Structures are given as C-alpha cells and as structure tokens.
Amino acid sequence: MGSVASLEPVYSTDFARSNIIELKSLSKNFGELKVLENIDFAIRAGEIFAIIGTSGSGKSTFLNIISGLLEQDSGSFRISGKASGQFSGWKRIAYMFQEDRLLPWRTVRDNVAFGLENTSLGKQAKKARIDEVIDLVGLHEFADYWPHQISGGMRSRVALARSLVIEPEVLLMDEPFSKLDAQTRSQMHGELLRLHDLTGMTVVFVTHDVEEAAVLADRVAVFSSRPGRVKEIVDVNLDRPRLLTDAHLSEQIRTLRKKI
C-alpha cells in the first residue's frame, strides 16, 4: 500500500473487484451459548462493508475473529487469498474500537505513534508518517495536546489516525462513532469517506445505527438475533454524498430497518 495521502486509490480496478475476506461456515460458541452460526459471505477489496443487527447478534465477536483476536470454533476464513492460519499480514489489519482507548499519559502525537512501536521503520520515517496522518485528520495544531484537552470528536480523529498510521489494507471499526453527538458523528462520516477515497482501503464496520450504515456502506450484512446468522446482504446503490434529506436514502433506511 502506498502513502496514506496518495490521491489515487491503492488498488487496481481488477483487485478492487476481488474478495479480500472470504468466510465459510464460520461459527463461534461461548460455552453452551451459540454466538455465530454458519457465517458465509465475502467482503470485496476496497469496499465499505457494514454489519447491522440486534444486540447480541455476534457482530463484535465477528470483528474479533476476522481481526485475529479470537478464534472461531468451526468453519474458516481467508484474507487476501490465504487461510487465516497462514496469513502473515495481521499488522496491516487495523481495529478502531468503540472506545477511543487513548493513553492519557501520551500526547496526541505519541498516541498516534503507538501504532508504529513494533515496526522496523526508522526514526525519520516514523516521524514523517505520524506527521502525515495527523495532518490528514486535521489535528496538526493539536499534536502536542493531551487527550483530556481535546473534544470527543477530536479524540475519535486521533484514534482514526492511530489506525491509519500503519497504512492498513483493512480497517475494522466497532461502533467507533456511537458516543458522539449527531453533528460530530456526521463530520466523522465525511472524514471516513474522504480518507477511504484517498487510500482505497477496505472498511468493515459494525453499527446499531441503520442511518449510519446506509450513509456509509456499499453493502450491508444484516445479522439475525443470537445465534448470529446472515439474514441478507443488501447492496446500497446510491451515489455519494448521501444526504438524509434525500428520498432515495430515506427509502433505503426504511428497507434496512424492516430487515433487522
């Protein structure tokens, strides 16, 4: 993957049509509790893919499995054409959690730098990349601030920059904007779409917010109640930007709500 600030998508047209994550009969239990059952679908390289469903439908568990944090009990999945057990590119999978998880004893710059601590990049290369992503999310003037000195929206930008600094091929997001007010959440939606256009990375995000899924995603997987199964995958064939005042978007939102 090239520079995060590249003006051209990093994937060729052919690669953008291929599957970057493929799931086959994926299931997960916690003791006697079935959380996920027979998950079968594929996520295309370069797309924004949303997962919606009721609480307890296994959405976050699913993200934890494809991030490598949790192992499935049965079934399998492939990343970039390789079985998960043989995949060696986990450092290019970024995970943005619901909580920003900023370290209070680190400045904005040092929180972003945390993502590069276990890499072989030289000091100057690290500094250049950190400065680049801080500029990219519009926080240059706040680079030396402490987390308690910045707003919730800014904290989300720091968390996003920390994810981007590793130049991920896939960005996983678990309700990252759910704690923000409506205006700030809308701003972060625009920020995510802008960065997606710049980098061409694949984005997979979980949300309870049907409007958020409709505004951001190319496709939406609807998970059933526990055990989580894929009820349907819905294509969102709407041009961007998608405004909530648009009648076509409103109809898409109504359609998704009916499917949950």
Describe the role of every protein-language-model region:
Residues 165-169:
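A short, proline-enriched helix->beta-strand linker immediately N-terminal to the Walker B motif
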Residues 67:
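Helix-to-loop junction immediately C-terminal to a conserved catalytic motif
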Residues 52-54:
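The feature captures the beta-strand-to-loop junction immediately N-terminal to the Walker
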Residues 124-142, 194:
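Conserved ABC ATPase "signature" region
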Residues 82-97, 118, 123-127, 243-247:
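ABC ATPase NBD coupling module
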Residues 146-150, 154:
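Conserved ABC ATPase signature
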